Amino acid sequence: VLPEERLATAAHWTAKSLEIAEYFEDARMTSYVLRMHGNELRKANLRGAAVQRLCRAAATAPDDTARAAALPLLARAAGALGNSALFDRVMRETEGLLDSVDHTSLFNPFSLHEIRLRGLVSTGRTRVAMQLVENSPVPTTVVAPQWRVIELVTVAHVQLLADDRTGAARSLDIAIREAVTQRLPHQLQRITRTAGTRLPTQHSTASQLLDRIRREMAA
């Protein structure tokens, strides 16, 4: 929920938490903190370090439940890094656990669909992403509300790559409303980048609302 300019702070403090977790030599706790720290590193664009921490989180996980919590984050980081081989391997393993591990706000078919779309684009397989973009699973109650916003922005990005400006504008309009309701400045920043110069109305609206949230956070 932090704007991008504050993400480095989150990465710093989760690193401090890792030092504490490792002291207790508890595999589950260490895996949890590693995945939180790795995810913050990814959001701060420290992608190589993120993949390293998230690989450790998956390796440290004491059971399939803990591993299923780490793997989606590792897939996101591997995709962002452009490592297609690691991304594909982790996605296969993650999807292989869907029938045997309870679903969570991150580990579920809806969230994994978004992760796959984004990873395919990041690893140079835009055409495959275009073929999958309309096949999003129906979100269930286990899906966290912010994941709907995350997915809408990713879908809009793929729609623009397919030159579907009407569909992308519709996706971003919904994402903007939800991002404001849920107070998600980072997603508004993603929206402005996605809209760019091709969707000036959505870019302007998201920018204005982002400025408003920043002022409220600074008050």
Locations of regions flagged by a protein language model:
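Conserved binding/catalytic microenvironments
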Residues: 1-219
